[in-house]
């Protein structure tokens, strides 16, 4: 039987910065262990059925399927979340949205809305950090709502709920001190949609018209009806869209408009306060 070390050395994945790490995650998953097990027991022999499972995982990855979809989970903030192909994979850059939200409101009671929640990543991270906040996450995809609810139940979070809604459509009369969203913001003609992991992600969670701003425009237009006085709206957007989003916020009647940079130095999150 092959050893852990042999299988990792023999793993053939497309050359990329994450190829070695991808193989480790996939073998650990096939074994039902953590990646530290691989380093602790490199000479451990692997059962044939485990080797076959690992080979199947590798083939899916060679075809470009994201590791998160193969494993059915993804880390975000301090959380381990279930993911599925009908939801966007949570990304590290989106943690900036969480950090910004935590800075905007005090730790006391507040009603907070997460639009287009997907896996529930943003709402769940905020619920973890602010036990007094009452979080609502909405998504138009019923499967995403079910998945987000499963994540909340598994994490034991009682201060968050998830409901099906196309943006604000199911929230008549509801007002919040803070609204956050990582909406679709990729241009329909963007060639990156045909490359890498995004080929496997739902286009409805990625694409927003010819300039990538259709959903952001709608959210900024409708948010004042659902914000309390002096409430905040925080939006993630593309690396080159900050100026356009700030202009939309100013034109929408928001004040204290500004942007923050992500890990790569790009303005990735913009926000404003309702006058």
Positions of PLM-derived features:
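Conserved SAM/SAH cofactor-binding pocket of Class I
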Residues: 92, 96-192, 197
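Conserved AdoMet
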Residues: 25-103
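Conserved Class I SAM-dependent methyltransferase catalytic core
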Residues: 210-273
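Active-site beta-alpha loop architecture of Rossmann-like, nucleotide-cofactor-dependent enzymes
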Residues: 68, 186-189, 240
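Short helix-capping segments at alpha-helix termini
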Residues: 16-17, 130-132, 153-158, 226-227, ...
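Residue-level signal for inorganic ion chemistry
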Residues: 26, 64, 94, 122, ...
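Non-catalytic nucleic-acid substrate-recognition regions in nucleic-acid-modifying enzymes
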Residues: 1-22
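Mobile active-site "lid"/loop adjacent to the S-adenosyl-L-methionine
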Residues: 185-215
């Amino acid at each position: 039987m092959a050893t852990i070390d042999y299988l990792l050395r023999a793993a053939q994945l497309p050359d990329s910065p994450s190829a070695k790490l991808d193989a480790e995650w996939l073998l650990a998953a096939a074994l039902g262990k953590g990646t530290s097990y691989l380093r602790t027991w490199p000479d451990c022999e692997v059962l044939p059925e485990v080797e076959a499972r690992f080979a199947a995982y590798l083939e899916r990855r060679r075809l470009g399927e994201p590791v998160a979809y193969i494993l059915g989970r993804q880390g975000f903030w301090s959380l381990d979340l279930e993911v599925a192909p009908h939801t966007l994979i949570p990304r590290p850059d989106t943690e900036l949205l969480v950090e910004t939200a935590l800075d905007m409101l005090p730790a006391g009671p507040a009603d907070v809305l997460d639009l287009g929640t997907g896996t529930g990543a943003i709402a769940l991270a905020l619920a973890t950090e602010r036990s007094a906040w009452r979080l609502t996450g909405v998504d138009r995809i019923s499967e995403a709502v079910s998945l987000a609810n499963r994540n909340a139940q598994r994490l034991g979070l009682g201060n968050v709920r998830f409901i099906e809604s196309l943006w604000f459509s199911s929230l008549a009369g509801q007002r919040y001190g803070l609204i956050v969203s990582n909406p679709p913001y990729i241009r329909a003609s963007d060639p990156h949609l045909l490359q890498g992991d995004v080929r496997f992600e739902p286009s409805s969670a990625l694409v927003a018209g010819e300039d990538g701003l259709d959903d952001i425009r709608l959210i900024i237009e409708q948010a004042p009806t659902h914000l309390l006085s002096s409430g905040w709206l925080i939006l993630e957007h593309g690396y080159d869209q900050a100026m356009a989003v700030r202009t939309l916020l100013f034109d929408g009647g928001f004040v204290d408009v500004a942007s923050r940079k992500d890990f790569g130095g790009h303005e990735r999150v913009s926000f404003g306060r309702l006058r």
